Amino acid sequence: MASNPTTARVCFATLLTTDSYVPGALTLAASLRATGTSHEIICLVADGQLSRSALERLELTFDRIVCVPILQSADTANLALLGRPDLGSTVTKIGIWNLTEYARIAFLDADTLVLGSIDSLLDMSNNDMAIGHDIRPNGGMENAGLLAAAPDLGWPDMFNS
């Protein structure tokens, strides 16, 4: 059954895998609230990876904290090429696909600063997807630092066929 986009539960979400991004995540939440959004703002946290004090600060700012299992990329060669071995845990953001209680989620990296309303990302139909486009000197590539889509546990199966 299709959900009604005007009444369905939707949210903005971010992910933290270390304490070092807590200031950015707090800034992201504050910048979203400054736009006047009425939508839920949630924070996914890698299970067992953040300090108690970091979690307490997040609980005061976000509407909901969701613990997700940490995932690590086994692609050490490409992480080394990027010079960013710390990005290995960014695949943990795939945990948003499990949040099927939401009809739509707009995922934003924790170091994002929102300067104006982006509520329209949550108003799109469930058949639409928005991905931030990142321009690089070697050509364009998609940046999953901004992703708006409808969670669906069956979605990853597309890649297995």
Language model segments and positions:
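Glycosyltransferase catalytic domains, chiefly GT-A lineage
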Residues: 1-161
